[in-house]
């Protein structure tokens, strides 16, 4: 098969090697963000107001109701919000009604409830000018879970937990003596019968009648020392509130509020759904033997005989009757916690693990509890206890906590709703208090409501929650992946330290829901995942994946798509996407490879229920961009997927010759491109904007409508300092459809994702320069700017009010020559377009110095003649080390001009410096298969090996990097790329359905290349051919964000730590290089005594010595003797602080006075130690404040 041509967007055709026709289009890839937030605005907010409304005061006289809400227009647009460092938000107004029940007076008011952050069209939020993403969280679903474990004696014990969304936990467990215990809210355990008595089943006989007679229950009753409901309630109260005097009334109220009060206990709709599903009677009846005859209550007809086995058919016959309420029993408990009847559904069966088959057990379901009952009910508790006893008798299943049917997603909407709930409940408290304090006649809703707690809760969530993250904006793919990320960490989730191996592991239920490949390396592995390409999230927060329905009558695979959750999928047999089908959609082969509950099985074709939609439904968007993924080892594929996210946008991006067909969709949905919103005709194309005149249909004719103007981003700094720039790809007069790409974003080429460049690669060694994965590169790639990228850095200077007077931004700076001021304008701010080097002035700023107290005469003179002698010091903003470049833009914000600035700031200046970074030695590069390396040598073109036609190679990679890493995909890509380049084609080779080995050999033949894809190479230095033929081809290589310019660092003097007086560490602190323990050993081994002494004293923490040494070097004198290092003094002081009498003695046993060493400090010249202000001091967590400023 030679593949067929497929169109991607307006401008690109690719030859696709896909064999499987896809029935389903890819969904919008950031739908998980946008639809969740939309739900919150439409439903979530309304739910919250309904939950707390009405608020009544303690006497029940005043009542405050929330009727409706509306969101106004945002104050700033997205662009303005970014520029002004404000939040992109809209005002939330709520219609509130206050009712005075005594007078019958009703007051209605619209109350402003704060600005609510809005989501941009691309699924992000702008908070204080920074673009942030709310990551979805994977948590345990509220439900009831049963688990078993074998103890040290080999006895199987069971435990169960009822987990609510919020509220007290209820746990059951067995011990070695077969007694069943319950724990309420993590307290000490009680026999489970105590809880049943508290619910109103006071005597032993009632409990036995309810649950059925069995030895576990008998053991528990023996252990139980209460014999009535009152005693049970008191017992529970003493456990939950130790030390308080128990009364019956208090005990009842406590239990009622813990479990049966909707405000204190919430299962959420998902918890109710899961509990009803788990405790329903039907799952436990399947494959069991009935111990009673089941009769239709209306017709008295026998549906199932006692002793009959319940198979699938009998169960299906029973189901309608079970739903009607066969076996429903209503208990009227005496004086329990709850008033009213308890209805449960009971059916008797024979215990399957009884050797005689005579023992009868009760199977109890929780009756029929409506979906909107969000708290737990007594029926739930009884049914969950019954399930526990059933498990002991071999009926029912334990749960796998890592199964995706038991884990759910909290997306943006729900996370926000939870925060909003916290804010509202705090506000509710305030409202109640104000109701009782203020005068009831004159009060208005506005006076009652304090919106501060609501605003604070929302602000706190967006500003400091673990799940609200600064968007990774290195390139469009990084952006897209960040929005589709699923994290198991965060509040209410796991912690890195506690998470075991099982949670992190790939589970069979991840198939089509979560990517098994894309996850970070390191401590977060498996805790942070990525959503698969086709996955969707249902209303309960479970991830669903699409399957094609197989028609059971005809055996044909239909085009009907069903989205299944993980626990629904467990009931079906699912065939792989690559199963061969006939023309009419039936399976060609009698036996089909399929999956059932994590087992890969071969089944007869009539047993298949569903079929995969596409081979790439298993993996995430980033993984689906790796061609020949099927030929790579998964560990390397993981690195490949992660490194694509670190690709720096290049000056001239180029789409991969060998792609997967995902490039177009990923780029389009990422939010980096400009997408057309309505069908229309392009009227005008400029670098900065595109005008599209809408075409609308009126009476069957197309007429011109409104004009849409699309603004393009030009050289904007992204969150990561890369350059975001958009370029139009449409022409004037083009007719564009809705959803078409009008302009490429960064790392895009003709609407496709283009993270790197296609270069000519040879797998060969060259003088050992590609040892350990190093890369040798041709100088052509430097000269022709193939791997040149643009980086923009932002620097800020602000003038504040200080105690001694305001700071001033000015050109007039003390002790600075005219030469240093040449690039500053009259305001003292650098001009746009100036070329600046490290240490140059960007913004001139002076701060008033502290002055001595003036005498009365001096003060009088000052008042008359004005302040002449004001002492100021230079606090200008300078270019930090490695930050030189060209000034791209300057933004000035003034308080006088009405700009919103933080308190105490009068003026804020932002300077943007742009750098053009060519590729250089030390930069990190990678392919898409996890084949990464650092450039070790850039050779002149003439020294590079060349092909027989004289073309020099661009890059040489080490062939030893392939076999042990098992990422053979790169070799396929190399050969296929070579052939495609020759034929002038672009190729799409989708994951798991791409070009085969045979296809690659065929296209090589078609391109007229050698069948083994190797070629003779000639040495550029000598012109001689190399001994063996070499694999040469086109590979897609990307430049990663780890650039040598950001890592190179040197220091002579700089800041020192306060306590030890040693230099700080790290580039961000402008620190020194650590000469560690092992390095000291090395010098000791060489006997290099003077070097060693110097390193341990004057170069490190001998305070006096280092000043004197600096002086000596400057004056050209001999370097003096070192003194005592500060760390030694610290050690002595620490020993003395432990109460030890430690003194230092000289060689002739004279005591050395430590104080003498400090005397010299006073004479140390001030100006010697240079204080360097690091640009990113905030990022340095280590010793942030511990800097001595000399």
UniProtKB/Swiss-Prot annotation:
One of its GO terms (molecular function) is DNA-directed RNA polymerase activity. Residues 1173-1190 have a biased composition (Basic and acidic residues). Residues 1155-1190 are annotated as: Disordered. The keyword Isomerase does not apply. PROSITE patterns: RNA_POL_BETA. It comes from Geobacillus kaustophilus (strain HTA426). CDD domains: RNA_pol_B_RPB2. It catalyses: RNA(n) + a ribonucleoside 5'-triphosphate = RNA(n+1) + diphosphate. PANTHER family: DNA-DIRECTED RNA POLYMERASE I SUBUNIT 2. DNA-dependent RNA polymerase catalyzes the transcription of DNA into RNA using the four ribonucleoside triphosphates as substrates. GO terms for biological process: DNA-templated transcription. Belongs to the RNA polymerase beta chain family. GO terms for cellular component: DNA-directed RNA polymerase complex. Its EC number is 2.7.7.6. Keywords: DNA-directed RNA polymerase, Nucleotidyltransferase, Transcription, Transferase. The RNAP catalytic core consists of 2 alpha, 1 beta, 1 beta' and 1 omega subunit. When a sigma factor is associated with the core the holoenzyme is formed, which can initiate transcription. This is DNA-directed RNA polymerase subunit beta. The lineage of its organism: Bacteria, Bacillati, Bacillota, Bacilli, Bacillales. The gene is rpoB. It comes from the Bacteria.
């Amino acid at each position: 098969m030679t593949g067929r041509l497929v169109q991607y967007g307006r401008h690109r055709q690719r030859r696709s090697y896909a064999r499987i026709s896809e029935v389903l289009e890819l969904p919008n890839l950031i739908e998980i963000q946008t639809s969740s937030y939309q739900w919150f605005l439409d439903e979530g907010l309304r739910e919250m107001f309904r939950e707390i409304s009405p608020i009544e005061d303690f006497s029940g006289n005043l009542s405050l109701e929330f009727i409706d809400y509306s969101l106004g227009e945002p104050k700033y647009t997205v662009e303005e919000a970014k520029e002004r460092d404000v939040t992109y938000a809209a005002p939330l107004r709520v219609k509130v009604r206050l009712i005075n029940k005594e007078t019958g007076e009703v007051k209605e008011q619209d109350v402003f409830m704060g600005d609510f952050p809005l989501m941009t069209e691309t699924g992000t939020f702008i908070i204080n000018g920074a673009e942030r993403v709310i990551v979805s969280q994977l948590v345990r679903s509220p439900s009831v879970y049963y688990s078993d474990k074998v103890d040290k004696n080999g006895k199987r014990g069971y435990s169960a937990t009822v987990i609510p969304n919020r509220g007290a936990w209820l746990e059951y467990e067995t011990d070695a003596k077969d007694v069943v215990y319950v724990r309420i809210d993590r307290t000490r355990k009680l026999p489970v019968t105590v809880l049943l008595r508290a619910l109103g089943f006071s005597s032993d006989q009632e409990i036995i009648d309810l649950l059925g007679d069995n030895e576990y229950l008998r053991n528990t009753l023996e252990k139980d020392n209460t014999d009535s409901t009152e005693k049970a309630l008191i017992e529970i109260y003493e456990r939950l509130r130790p030390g308080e005097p128990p009364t019956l009334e208090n005990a009842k109220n406590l239990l009622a509020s813990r479990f049966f009060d909707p405000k204190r206990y919430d299962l959420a709709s998902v918890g109710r759904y899961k509990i009803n599903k788990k405790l329903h009677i039907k799952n436990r009846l399947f494959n069991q033997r009935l111990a009673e005859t089941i009769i239709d209550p209306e017709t008295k007809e026998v549906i199932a005989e006692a002793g009959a086995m319940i198979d699938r058919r009998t169960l299906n016959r029973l189901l309608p009757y079970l739903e009607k309420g066969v076996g429903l029993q209503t208990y009227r408990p005496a004086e329990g916690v709850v008033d009213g009847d308890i209805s449960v559904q009971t059916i008797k069966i024979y215990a399957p693990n009884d050797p005689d088959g005579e023992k009868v057990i009760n199977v109890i379901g929780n009756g029929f509890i409506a979906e909107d009952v969000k708290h737990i009910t007594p029926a739930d508790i009884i049914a969950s206890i019954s399930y526990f006893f059933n498990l002991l008798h071999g009926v029912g299943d334990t749960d796998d906590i890592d199964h995706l049917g038991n884990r759910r997603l909290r997306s943006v909407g729900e996370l926000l709703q939870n925060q909003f709930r916290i804010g509202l409940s705090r506000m509710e408290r305030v409202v109640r208090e104000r109701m009782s304090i203020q005068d009831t006649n004159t009060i208005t809703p506005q006076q009652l409501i304090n919106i501060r707690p609501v605003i604070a809760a929302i602000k706190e969530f967006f500003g400091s929650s673990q799940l609200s993250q600064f968007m990774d904006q290195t390139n469009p793919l990084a952006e897209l992946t960040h929005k589709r990320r699923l994290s198991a960490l965060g509040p209410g989730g796991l912690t890195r330290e506690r998470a075991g191996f099982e949670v992190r592991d790939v589970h069979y239920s991840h198939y089509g829901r979560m990517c098994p490949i894309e996850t970070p390396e390191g401590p977060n592995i498996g805790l942070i995942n990525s959503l698969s390409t086709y996955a969707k999230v249902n209303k309960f927060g479970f991830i669903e994946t699409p399957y094609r329905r197989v028609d059971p009558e005809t055996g044909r695979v239909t085009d009907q798509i069903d989205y299944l959750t993980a626990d629904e999928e467990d009931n079906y047999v699912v065939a792989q996407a690559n199963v061969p089908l006939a023309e009419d959609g039936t399976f060609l082969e009698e036996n089909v490879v399929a999956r059932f509950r994590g087992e890969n099985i071969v089944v007869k074709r009539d047993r298949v229920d569903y079929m995969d939609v596409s081979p790439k439904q298993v993996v995430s968007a980033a993984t689906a961009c790796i061609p020949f993924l099927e030929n790579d080892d998964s560990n390397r594929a993981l690195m490949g997927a992660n490194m694509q996210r670190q690709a720096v946008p290049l000056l001239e991006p180029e789409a991969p010759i060998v792609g997967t067909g995902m490039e177009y969709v990923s780029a389009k949905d990422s939010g980096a491109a400009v997408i057309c919103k309505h069908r229309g005709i392009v009227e005008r194309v400029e670098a900065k904007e595109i005008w599209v005149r809408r075409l609308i249909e009126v009476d069957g004719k197309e007429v011109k409508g409104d004009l849409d103007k699309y603004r393009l981003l030009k050289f904007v700094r992204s969150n990561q300092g890369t350059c975001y720039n958009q370029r139009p790809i449409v022409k004037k007069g083009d007719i564009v459809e809705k959803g078409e790409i009008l302009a490429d974003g960064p790392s895009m080429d003709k609407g496709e994702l283009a993270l790197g460049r296609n270069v000519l690669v040879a797998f060969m060694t060259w003088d050992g320069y590609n040892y350990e994965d190093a890369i040798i590169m041709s100088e052509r790639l430097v000269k022709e700017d193939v791997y040149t990228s643009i980086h923009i850095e932002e620097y800020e200077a602000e003038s504040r009010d200080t105690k001694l007077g305001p700071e001033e931004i000015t050109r007039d700076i003390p002790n600075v020559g005219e030469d240093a001021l040449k690039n500053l304008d009259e305001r003292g701010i650098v001009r746009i377009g100036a070329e600046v080097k490290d240490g140059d002035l960007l913004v001139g700023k002076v701060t008033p110095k502290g002055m001595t107290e003036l005498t009365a005469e001096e003060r009088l003179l000052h008042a008359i003649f004005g302040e002449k002698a004001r002492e100021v010091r230079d606090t200008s903003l300078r270019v930090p080390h490695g930050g030189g470049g060209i000034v791209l833009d300057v933004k000035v914000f003034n308080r006088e001009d009405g700009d919103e600035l933080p308190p105490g700031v009068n003026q804020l200046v932002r300077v943007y410096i742009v750098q053009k970074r060519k590729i250089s030695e030390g930069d990190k590069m990678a392919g898409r298969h996890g084949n990464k390396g650092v450039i070790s040598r850039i050779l002149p073109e003439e020294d590079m090996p060349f092909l027989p036609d004289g073309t020099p190679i661009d890059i040489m990679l080490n062939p030893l990097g392939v076999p042990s890493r098992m990422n053979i995909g790169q070799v396929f890509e190399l050969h296929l790329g070579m052939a495609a380049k020759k034929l002038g084609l672009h190729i799409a080779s989708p994951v798991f359905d791409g070009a085969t080995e045979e296809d690659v050999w065929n296209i090589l033949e078609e391109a007229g290349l050698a069948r083994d894809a190797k070629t003779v190479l000639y040495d550029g230095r000598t012109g001689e051919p190399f001994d063996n033929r070499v694999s040469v081809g086109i590979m897609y290589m990307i430049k990663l964000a780890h650039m040598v310019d950001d890592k190179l660092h040197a220091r002579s003097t700089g800041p020192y730590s306060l306590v030890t007086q040693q230099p700080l560490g790290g580039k961000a602190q402008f620190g020194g290089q650590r000469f560690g323990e092992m390095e000291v050993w090395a010098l000791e081994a060489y006997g290099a005594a003077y070097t060693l002494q110097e390193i341990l004293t004057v170069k490190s923490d001998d305070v006096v010595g280092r000043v004197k040494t600096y002086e000596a070097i400057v004056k050209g004198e001999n370097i003096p003797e070192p003194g005592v290092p500060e760390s030694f003094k610290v050690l002595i002081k620490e020993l003395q602080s432990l109460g030890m009498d430690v003194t230092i003695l000289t060689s002739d046993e004279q005591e050395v006075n430590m104080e003498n060493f400090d005397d010299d400090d006073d004479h140390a010249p001030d100006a010697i130690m240079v204080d360097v202000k690091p640009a990113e001091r905030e990022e340095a967590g280590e010793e942030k404040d511990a800097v001595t400023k000399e």
